[in-house]
Amino acid sequence: MLSRQERKRKVKVQFLGAHNCESATTRLVSILVDDILALDAGGLTSSLPIESQLDLKAVLLTHHHYDHIRDIPALGMNALFYETSVSVYATQAVRDALASHWLNGIIYVNFLEKPPESPRIQFTVIEPNRAFTVAGYEILPVPVNHSAPTVGYQVTAPDGKTLFYTGDTGPGLAEAWPFTSPQLLITEVTAPNRFEEFGRRMLHLTPSLLKEELLAFQKQKGYLPQVVLVHMNPRQEKEIDAEVKQLSSELGTSITLAYEGMVIQL
């Protein structure tokens, strides 16, 4: 049984990067849970001081596209200099992509294997729909629909509070709903509604496509979670924001755009 203090504890969710393009004011997607679990690595080293990087217990990667894995080499180099290692969890497809294209000894040092006696990236291959535990948090990888093999992660804190981060996804996200029941849903909206055909073709969401998935969630689960959106195109963000506000009003639930530095207490 949880103590009273544990029941009152808040789960901290910090958005280090919230966009699909990087600039002086926007970063690629990375989300930090309770300062120790990182969801994707688009904006980790550019956002966190070394001390905070060393506090990470795990980096969970959804898929192998550049904007989600970019900082893995830099994390490996920092781990080398500070004589430690970083634990990375992802599918075999992600490991293969890192090893062949990114940490291949040509673009950057292969920290998956070097130094031989103690590789700086300790990589654990995960299986979709097979839960595992990191630092007391239960992690469930759930397949989602995207142009590369992708899993979202349901993260359940020791006190039972739950979030689900989809990573990049398009129409068909409802196939994940039977496996997850979050209080907080972190998903993507890449473009405004006028790009719906693009979203269907490239497997990304617009507000109108998100609406279809949320209605399916509500039908299956009987409720709607708090929703926070990432992976926005900065050029179209004002248009996306207006459409998301309308969607939030229509569905009667909190749906907001994330921003760099945003913190939610769950």
Give the role of each language-model region.
Residues 45-90:
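Active-site metal-binding motif and surrounding structural segment of the metallo-beta-lactamase
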Residues 171-261:
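Cap/insert and terminal regions of metallo-dependent hydrolase folds
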Residues 94-150, 157-158, 254-264:
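Metallo-beta-lactamase
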Residues 78-84, 107-114, 214-224:
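Alpha-helix termini
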Residues 8-52, 151-167:
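Conserved beta-strand hairpin/beta-sheet module of binuclear metal-dependent hydrolase folds
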Residues 38-42, 57-67, 89-91, 164-169, ...:
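Active-site neighborhood of phospho(di)ester-bond hydrolases with catalytic His/Asp-centered motifs
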Residues 13, 31, 39, 63, ...:
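Divalent metal-coordination and catalytic microenvironments
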Residues 48-53, 132-135, 175-178:
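Short amphipathic alpha-helix with an adjacent loop that forms part of the alpha/beta core around
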